[in-house]
Amino acid sequence: MSLGIDIHVKESVLCIRLTGELDHHTAETLRKQVSGHLEQTDIRHIVMNLADLSFMDSSGLGVVLGRYKEIKQLGGEMIVCAISPAVKRLFDMSGLFKIIRLEQSEQRALETLGVAS
């Protein structure tokens, strides 16, 4: 299975919706797309909606961590939302939730960042 990437900007937030599998075959594509948006637009925060992401491996975790570091350097925050149980377990085991906030929905994540829907 491949990775579907839907990226849109809402005020100063880069909203990323992923579907399918984020693994070593697809991680570089996501990295390039997100980094390109961060370079070209006035983005302060990232919301990553993982509701339809069925699989993630360590390469996917690396991409998430790398984008977290990028947005932190810009003074922003990353929020992961609507995460599936399997992917949530991977985040839990990796310790990423110690630095990246988890919200139940994209709507709630945007509200947390002060962006109206």
From Swiss-Prot:
Q: Which GO molecular function annotations are given, in alphabetical order?
A: anti-sigma factor antagonist activity; antisigma factor binding
Please list the GO biological process terms of this entry.
Answer: sporulation resulting in formation of a cellular spore
Top-level taxonomic group: Bacteria
Q: Which residues carry this modification: Phosphoserine?
A: S58
Residues annotated as domain STAS: 3-113
Q: Which PROSITE patterns match?
A: STAS (PS50801)
Q: Tell me its family.
A: Belongs to the anti-sigma-factor antagonist family.
Q: Its function?
A: In the phosphorylated form it could act as an anti-anti-sigma factor that counteracts SpoIIAB and thus releases sigma f from inhibition.
Which protein, by its recorded name, is this? Anti-sigma F factor antagonist
